[in-house]
Amino acid sequence: MKKFFVTAAFPYVNGYLHLGHLVTYIKAEITARYKKMRGYDVLFPMGFHATGAPIYAAAYKVSIGDPKQIETLKKMGIKDIEKFKDPAYWVEYFSKAAKEDLSKLGFMIEWERSFTTVFNKPFHKFVEWQYHRLREKGYIYRGAHPIVWDPKVNMVIGDHDRPDDYAGIRPIEGVIIKFYSKDLDAYLPAFTLRPETVFGVVNIWVNPETEYVLAKVKKVFYVYELYSLYKKFGRLPLNIENRDKLEKLIQDYNNLLDRLKQYEKGIDLIAHAEEIAYKPKEEFVKELKEFAEKEGIKIEEKDIELLYEYYNTKVETQEEKWILPNTIVIEELKNQDFEIEIIGKIDKLIKTLAENPVTKELVPVLPAKFVDPEVGTGIVMSVPSHAPYDYVGLLDLIKTELKEFAEQALKNVRPVVKVEGFSEMPAKDIVESMNITSQEERDKLEKATQRLYSKEFYHGVLTEHAQQFQGLPVKEAKMKIAEYLMENGYGYIYYTLPVRFKSRYGNKVVVKLVKGQWFIKYSDKQWKELAHKAVENMKFYPPQVKELIKEKIDWYDDWAFTHQKELGTALPWDPKWVIESLSDSTIYTAYYTIAHILQHPEKYNIDWDKLTIDVFDYVFLGKGDPKEIAKKTGISEEILKEMRNQFEYWYPVDIRFSAQDLIANHLVFYIFHHVAIFPESKWPRGIAVSGFVTVNGEKMSKSKGNFITIREAIQRYGRDAVRLAAAYAGNAELVDQNIDLEFMEKAKNEIIPRIESYLDMEGYDRDENSLDKWIVNRIRLYFKKLEEYYENIRPRDVINEFFKLENDFNFYRALVLEKPHKRAIEYFKKAVKALWPIIPHVVREPAWIGKEEPDEPWIRVGQYVDQVIKDLANTLKLVRISMARNVSHRLADLVKLYYEGAKLTEEEKEEIREFIEWKPVRIKIIYKNPSEFDILRDIIPYIEKVFGGKVVLELASESKEEKAKRAKEFKPAFVIE
């Protein structure tokens, strides 16, 4: 018996499971049952995810009496609100509820292997082991990094800690360029993603509806940021004193890191040095010496002093006056080590002049509503030759009292980037081609900006106006010019968000430059190559997911994988940090293989504290001697071997089910971590992804009344109706998966009872005719199609195929005058039972017909019979119309209208009753091919019952009828008498 291991992205247990969860889970459930039906040994486990901020935040809100959170719980029908002050109770309550809901639906989940990701020591030990191994391979480091941050609660905001609409939004890197205004005796710091266009600035934009303030500003560079800059540019491009000395310090630090890599605890020494860097130098040196001696690390005192100097290094710039919007921008600057003191408000900003630091030209400050005062610095430089927003903004200003300024700005326009297919003013070209007439046309302007930026970035070259950078490709010049600006004191590398949003705590988020943060090196080229190798050998449903994942593998840079003040697994070597929710759920599928043992220590006599790295190394990697490990840990050799065998038997995962929104993060991490830790034979084999879920064609929303939990749906419609509707929502495709509540109602009242009735049918023991052979072969074709649909995760197609077969079978029953052959009934019951993966409570037991290939000629019998009956019915209509015409044209027209479905009055129906009820005395069917005889003979009883008259069959070649000439192969002619 072959094994088959099915997993699905486990649910986050901060509420009841809803229909959105079910759309993904039903596909996993159907696949698991299908494989079981086909004889596989199937494992389908399910755990519960609770890592991160959402539960922590919700419990906190309950503890402070937040009315909105309390009302949310009450609407769920929860009465004992007090208990929800405790995050552990949230996890316990909703994981139990999720298990109940999926169990009521009859999911074949092996609950013995269930677990939660928090308050669960064996799982924490497993995650710790994973990160020790990643660190050992050099994929973990500490540094400064821009992350999304909630400044009110001082927490990193990951994808699970924000509204779903903002998942995937990351900090973007740009440059602040300082334009000095003599009028204001202050700098206007303009944020740009395109520093190479600074040579084409004709004005500065500010938002006229925003309050701007004057502030004292000083930038502080801590060692981590200095190190990041050095890493990016290979030197320190800063206008600071002692730059050479700082560069040498960083070089010496790098060399020391390389030397320490030979020691198993070398990285721990560096981490410890950082932890105690705040202590006096003598104490620092003494403590680090002791640590090195204890771990057997050879390090000289001068190297320890180097570490002390390195971790206590920071550089401050000279204080300057800046103009800033009085918005969240100031908070974001502070979180990136800008010291800011607000002096006062700015009364007049529009029409003042500022100097371009590169060209030394004076440019005016002008108003533009498109400037977002909460993004970047709330101040933007205007380059109308290359920015559609800027060009349209100036056109709009020409219509105002600032016409003179706008016209002069447009006269000063110069091309900075040359790109084939555009004039010297590419922005003007694209604005006119897209017929953009106002800065209010945001969507069109965004598309124009993206299109032009992409074209110029990949194909553009700098013109003579770019001074010493003339001739450089844009993609090369961008960072060189950023480096030039920083080196000359004209600007800084800076991070912001493309759009401002709120965290689940309800606060606006910023980009923070976190120091001492822990990162995973997803930027590592060799690691990316391994991930790509895995992808090439995997199956994806639908196939286009493959390219999306490959793009994301290439796109990912290093990832901040630790947060603070959250639920989860503490980082083993730095426990003040917690491994965040996407990063602890990467290889948990391996934990399923042993969870039934580790989650039940009383049964297997396991002390969770003894779950060492050696235990997991043996179980998952086959390293070490189980006898020795048993002696050290007290875990019996037998249990160790059983865990190893369980992993070896079940792994790898044969197919993983997930939702479209997890392509960009979880599924990419899932692949990265598997290839880093496990041998190639244990890499994932397949991934199935479904599109976004809608209910009645709309996104689920409580305000729309279409947000329905699984338990509500079961209570309202019944479990198999819910399963059927969830399966019918869609295939594994990147299109909306729509749960139709009308279909669910119909499933409850019509479809399910109808299917149940089929299982009670009985057949007749009579001679088999051509119609019986047709339906048996039609059912064989059904099974062939079902195999394709089940294998390719297409449950909607499975159901539709059944509906088609159902129509054909009912047609067959009618043709045989409700006396179906017992073999046909036997086959049809198997066809119904093949729906066991979808509706197991109705079907009760599965069935499959094996490898019986359909006979194509017999399949065509049904189509032939259907066409004969339609042609005969049409012929009889024409005869009746002709009979009516012999009486009057009016009656003929009424008969024709009747057959076309027109509404007639009762009087009109009475007038034509004799014609529409007329039945022939005899119907002669003239066929051309002798092979048609048996089929036509077998449908004579049906024709005589439905159409009346006696049916006579004649071979065209033997017929004396004039119409015999009209008979064609498998298209008989009719003579009506």
Swiss-Prot record:
EC number from the UniProt entry: 6.1.1.4
Motif 'HIGH' region: chain residues: 11-21
Keyword Cytoplasm: yes
Positions of ATP binding: 702
Residue ranges, annotated region (Insert): 220-318
Cellular localisation: Cytoplasm
GO biological process: leucyl-tRNA aminoacylation
Catalytic activity annotation: tRNA(Leu) + L-leucine + ATP = L-leucyl-tRNA(Leu) + AMP + diphosphate
Domain of life: Archaea
Disulfide pattern: none
Chain positions of motif 'KMSKS' region: 699-703
CC terms in the record's Gene Ontology section: cytoplasm
UniProt xrefs under InterPro entries: aa-tRNA-synth_I_CS (IPR001412), aa-tRNA-synth_Ia (IPR002300), Leu-tRNA-synth_Ia_arc/euk (IPR004493), M/V/L/I-tRNA-synth_anticd-bd (IPR013155), Rossmann-like_a/b/a_fold (IPR014729), tRNAsynth_Ia_anticodon-bd (IPR009080), Val/Leu/Ile-tRNA-synth_edit (IPR009008)
Main location: cytoplasm
Molecular function per GO: aminoacyl-tRNA deacylase activity; ATP binding; leucine-tRNA ligase activity
Keywords: Aminoacyl-tRNA synthetase, ATP-binding, Cytoplasm, Ligase, Nucleotide-binding, Protein biosynthesis
Keyword Kinase: no
Family in the record: Belongs to the class-I aminoacyl-tRNA synthetase family.
The protein's name: Leucine--tRNA ligase
